[in-house]
């Protein structure tokens, strides 16, 4: 069973993930990509739409899918009805899948991170292992991380926490000290800056725009006045909309 299936079929508690996704600020892609990496987990966007009202509808329909366990085809059907009613072309199956999968996976991993970092869990299972799907579709950098084990509080998880790219299928699992020892797993301290795949060197980084942990810093109280102007404007738009 892959991560996406787990999201839609398990009894995993998504209250935190739902709350976090619902509180994201809808932005145009231009606004979103102008943000520093540390602020992107507070925002939501979909490329190729300059009307924030369209992006707001994407967020609403995705949130409904996360809350209700809707399928990608449910999402695509509802969004295409809206888009076509507003003079836009409908989403192709591939594009709908990219948008749906990325956001569902992010919601799952935010919820999973909160579970893994609870004091009780960290005490019993203080190590985390990166797991990539090792097949012909796996990116070289993601494959290079496959099976690596680090302490749960290692800084690597500030960067290498999935999703680490569009259509990323990676996950992070927790391990007890006993499991690490019995399986003979190597406990990593550092990772190489460059890896080689089929004779080609790659910088060992997640994909562009996926180089921060989507769950980091979301519990902290945020002073809206300290946010970049584009997020402050989005906050005001969202506040005004909620009053209607």
Protein language model regions, located:
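Domain-core detector
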Residues: 1-165, 173-244
């Amino acid at each position: 069973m892959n991560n996406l299936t787990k999201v839609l079929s398990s009894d995993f508690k998504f209250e935190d993930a739902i709350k976090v996704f619902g509180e994201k600020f809808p932005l145009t892609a231009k606004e979103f990509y102008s943000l520093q990496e540390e602020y992107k987990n507070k925002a939501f966007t979909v490329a190729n739409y300059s009307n924030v009202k369209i992006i707001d509808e994407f967020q609403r329909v995705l949130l409904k899918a996360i809350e209700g366990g809707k399928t990608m085809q449910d999402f695509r059907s509802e969004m295409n009805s809206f888009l076509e009613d507003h003079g836009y072309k409908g989403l192709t199956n591939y594009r709908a899948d990219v948008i749906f999968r990325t956001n569902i996976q992010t919601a799952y991993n935010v919820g999973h991170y909160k579970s893994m970092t609870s004091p009780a869990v960290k005490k019993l299972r203080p190590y985390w292992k990166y797991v990539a799907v090792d097949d012909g579709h796996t990116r070289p950098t993601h494959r290079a991380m496959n099976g690596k084990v680090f302490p749960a509080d290692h800084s690597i998880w500030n960067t290498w926490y999935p999703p680490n790219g569009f259509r990323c299928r990676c996950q992070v699992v927790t391990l007890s000290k006993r499991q690490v020892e019995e399986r003979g797993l190597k406990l990593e301290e550092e990772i190489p800056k460059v890896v080689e795949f089929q004779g080609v060197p790659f910088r060992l980084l997640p994909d562009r725009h996926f180089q921060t942990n989507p769950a980091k810093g979301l519990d902290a109280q945020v002073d809206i006045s300290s946010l970049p102007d584009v997020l402050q404007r989005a906050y005001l738009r969202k506040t005004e909309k909620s009053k209607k």
